[in-house]
Amino acid sequence: MTLTAGVVAVQGDVSEHAAAIRRAADAHGQPADVREIRTAGVVPECDVLLLPGGESTAISRLLDREGIDAEIRSHVAAGKPLLATCAGLIVSSTDANDDRVETLDVLDVTVDRNAFGRQVDSFEAPLDVDGLADPFPAVFIRAPVIDEVGADATVLASWDGRPVAIRDGPVVATSFHPELTADVRLHELAFFDRTPSAQAGDA
């Protein structure tokens, strides 16, 4: 059965996420049909969604203007998986600590935007992630931090004592960019019954 995956194609690493979900699906013996989402009407056709990074205020405005935000909320309410990364985490949150960001309120967290500094301060670090046997090569670029975690959410990984990956029901969100590595285990963790394959980060 083909997996229909939608990538919100407003900003961010759209092609990288598309490639990652194809590799993750292939690792589980399942073909993937990847669709780019720019207007309403595509989300209801998708089994899984990816919300990449970019600029959170711009992303939230476009989602609201096009009516994609309501479709994403319905997708999550139906128990369908969503992987949100970096600015996608901010937009997905309950509270972005920024009135300019219209959040989706599908991830019960409060977020501190750009908590890990400017783009020049970006870094990569091996990260222990709950559910993964080996450290994940996490790429942080002006990354947000999860300040507060709701009762139903679970912290999957922390860096320097602060949460940077979380699961809330069908939503997995990361402060870092899993699509910028050859390691697709985070995409597997989000979309394939929480059973990532035994794939090394340099595969």
Curated annotation (Swiss-Prot):
Q: Tell me, what is an example of a GO biological process annotation in this record?
A: pyridoxine metabolic process
Q: Entry's SUPFAM superfamilies?
A: Class I glutamine amidotransferase-like
Q: Name one GO molecular function term.
A: glutaminase activity
What cellular component terms from Gene Ontology apply here?
cytosol; glutaminase complex
Q: Which CDD domains match?
A: GATase1_PB
**InterPro entries, alphabetically?**
Class_I_gatase-like, PdxT/SNO, PdxT/SNO_CS
Catalytic residue list? C86, H177, E179
- Which PROSITE patterns would you find in this protein's record? PDXT_SNO_1 (PS01236), PDXT_SNO_2 (PS51130)
Q: Which reaction does it catalyse?
A: aldehydo-D-ribose 5-phosphate + D-glyceraldehyde 3-phosphate + L-glutamine = pyridoxal 5'-phosphate + L-glutamate + phosphate + 3 H2O + H(+); L-glutamine + H2O = L-glutamate + NH4(+)
- Which residues are involved in binding L-glutamine? G54, E55, S56, R113, I141, R142
User: Is Membrane one of the keywords?
Assistant: no
What Enzyme Commission number(s) does the record list for this chain? Answer: 4.3.3.6, 3.5.1.2
Q: Which UniProt keywords apply?
A: Glutamine amidotransferase, Hydrolase, Lyase, Pyridoxal phosphate
KW Calcium (keyword) present: no
Biochemical pathway? Cofactor biosynthesis; pyridoxal 5'-phosphate biosynthesis
Q: What does this gene product do?
A: Catalyzes the hydrolysis of glutamine to glutamate and ammonia as part of the biosynthesis of pyridoxal 5'-phosphate. The resulting ammonia molecule is channeled to the active site of PdxS.
Summary of subunit composition and partner proteins: In the presence of PdxS, forms a dodecamer of heterodimers. Only shows activity in the heterodimer.
Q: Which family does it belong to?
A: Belongs to the glutaminase PdxT/SNO family.
* Protein name as it appears in the record: Pyridoxal 5'-phosphate synthase subunit PdxT
